[in-house]
Amino acid sequence: MILMLVQVILIMIFVIQSIAFVTLYERHLLGGSQQRIGPNKVSFMGFLQAIFDGVKLLKKEQMTPLNSSEISFILVPGIFFIVMYLEWFVLPFFYDFMTFEYSILFFLCLIGFSVYTTLVSGMVSKSKYGMVGAIRASSQSVSYEIAFSLYLLAIVMHINMFCFFSFFNLSLFIVYLPFLFMVLAELNRAPFDFAEGESELVSGYNVEYSSVAFVLLFLGEYGALLFFSTLTSVLFFGFSYVVIYCMFTILVFVRSSYPRFRYDLMMYFFWFKLLPVSLIFLGYFVIFLF
C-alpha cells in the first residue's frame, strides 16, 4: 500500500516537472519559428523561467465572477487536472502496482468525460466568451470522438486486446496521420483551437480564471499534451522518450505554422473525411485479420 502511494505521488511529480520544462521548450520553439530568442533571462538561458512563472501565477488573487457558483467555479479546474492525471494510468510504463486489462476502454471514458469539464468551466464563469468557447468545445468533441473511437477500435482489432502496450508494427503507420489530426482536436491545439480562440474569444472557456484555478487548467492542458505525445509513441513507434519529444515538437510546429480552421470546415473535415476513413480502416482490420 505504501509503495503504491509512493508510485502515485512520483507519477504526479514526474508529470508536473515535465510540464514545467516542456512549456519552456515550447516557448523556445515558438520563438525560433518567429526568428526570436524566447525566454532567456531567468537563470541560465531561461532554464527556470517556467518555475518562476508558476510561482507568480500562484501569488495572483482568485476572483470569482459575481453571478457564478463559487463552488463549481473552483472545483472544475481541479477535476480537469484529475482527469488528465488519471490518463497516465492507462500506460503501464510508469507503475507496477496493478494490471489494467481494459485500459483502452477506460481511456475512452476519460476523453469523453474531459469535454464536460471544459463545458462546465465555460458555463459557470458566466462570461459570453467562456460560454461560446464551451459550446465550441462540446460540438467539436462530438465531431472527432466518433472517428477517434473507431480508430482505437481498429487498433484493438489489430492487437487483439484492450490494453495499451508498447509495440512496433508497420501496418499501423497508415493510421498515424489521421490519428495526429484527432489528437490536435482533442488537445484544442491549432488549427483546431476553437475552444480558446485568442483572436476571437480572448481566452475562451478559461477567460475568467486566475491564480491556482488557472494553474490547474494549464497543468491539465499541457499534461494532456505530453500524455498524447507519449501515447503516440506507444501505439506507433514503440515506447521511446526520443519519439515522445519528437511528437511534442511536431505539435508545437503545427501551432506555429498553420492558422485556425473555419469552424464549419472543421466539422466537415471530421464528419465527411476522417469518419469514412476510420470505417475503412476498421473494415480492413476486421476482414483481413479475422
From Swiss-Prot:
It comes from the Eukaryota. Its main location: mitochondrion. The keyword Isomerase does not apply. Keywords: Electron transport, Membrane, Mitochondrion, Mitochondrion inner membrane, NAD, Respiratory chain, Translocase, Transmembrane, Transmembrane helix, Transport, Ubiquinone. Its EC number is 7.1.1.2. It catalyses: a ubiquinone + NADH + 5 H(+)(in) = a ubiquinol + NAD(+) + 4 H(+)(out). The chain crosses the membrane at residues 2-22, 73-93, 104-124, 142-162, 164-184, 212-232, 234-254, 269-289. Signal peptide: none annotated. It is a multi-pass membrane protein. It is found in: Mitochondrion inner membrane. GO terms for cellular component: mitochondrial inner membrane. GO terms for biological process: aerobic respiration. One of its GO terms (molecular function) is NADH dehydrogenase (ubiquinone) activity. Belongs to the complex I subunit 1 family. Core subunit of the mitochondrial membrane respiratory chain NADH dehydrogenase (Complex I) that is believed to belong to the minimal assembly required for catalysis. Complex I functions in the transfer of electrons from NADH to the respiratory chain. The immediate electron acceptor for the enzyme is believed to be ubiquinone. This is NADH-ubiquinone oxidoreductase chain 1. It comes from Ascaris suum (Pig roundworm).
